[in-house]
Amino acid sequence: MNLFNADHNSEVSCYRIPSIITASNGDLIVAIDERVPSCGDLKWSDDINIVMRKSSDNGNTWTPIRTIVDYPKGESASDPSMIFDEVTNTIFLFFNFMNHINEKDKYYLKYISSSDYGKSWSDPVDITNQISKKNWSNDFKFITSGRGFQAKDGTLLHCLVNLQNGTHVFGSKDNGKTWFISKTPVTPGNESKIIELSDGSWMVNSRVNNSGYRYSHISTDFGNTWNSKKEIDLIDPGSNGSLIRYNQNSQNFLLLSNINDQKERRELVIRYSLDEGKSWSDPRIIYREEAAYSSMTVLSNGDIGLFFEADNYRNNFFTRIKLDEIIEF
């Protein structure tokens, strides 16, 4: 199902940067950039809004497109990502902000939240100072789009890219009241996803430009130190993927979606890992043509929901995949 296509709106250049989560009531929420004057990223576009749609029937039908972050022209919000806090039933939707008129090239890191499954949203909250380090003020930094993760103890975890100072984990131990940033960056790494492993350690899976592969990074001390390796079975051209845990119907394993090509953004696949990311299955091809960023979630009926960019950023599809199409037990 094609959820966002700029061909149907003459005022929009393209929709990019998909994010999807499942709320505790089973609702699916998708968010994406609405890029108005051009398809350029935040640094190069002065009018990007964030819009959403919602499904209450596992993706069969969707609400109309609705704008949830919209600053005046000259100010842009981009790169949505979400975490659903199971403790407080709160959706956190993170985004990156730039004022092209007064502070061009300066990145701010913000979120809005919803306590009613996306019906209403808070005003933006600026957490730049909480999740930045000294001397980062003018760095090229941004919260990774897609989604974050909630650990077993309730800690909210997510990834932040700083092109000058490395990719860091950030999060909250008090359900979003305050935020922290990890001591040490993962290297190498661009847009990254974090998951908690069964032993409580953190695993970050990273896009690494110009390498042809993804990298994984594991920390057993909450981001103070990292053990990193090139994942030779996970080829990648340098594109944002999605890493989630499937924990439903007595099944518990990891899922990864990414582009299965070392040079071009084409052939979107899903792999699974039954050993906490030590090894990965052969890829299951979801889309053979041009594709790019993807975001995954587990639906209330046990299916996998995948929201992804396709066809040179013209289309943004949602597809539902049954578990037995990917994995055999």
Please provide the spans of the model-predicted regions.
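Asp-box/BNR beta-propeller blade signature and adjacent active/binding-site loops
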Residues: 1-329
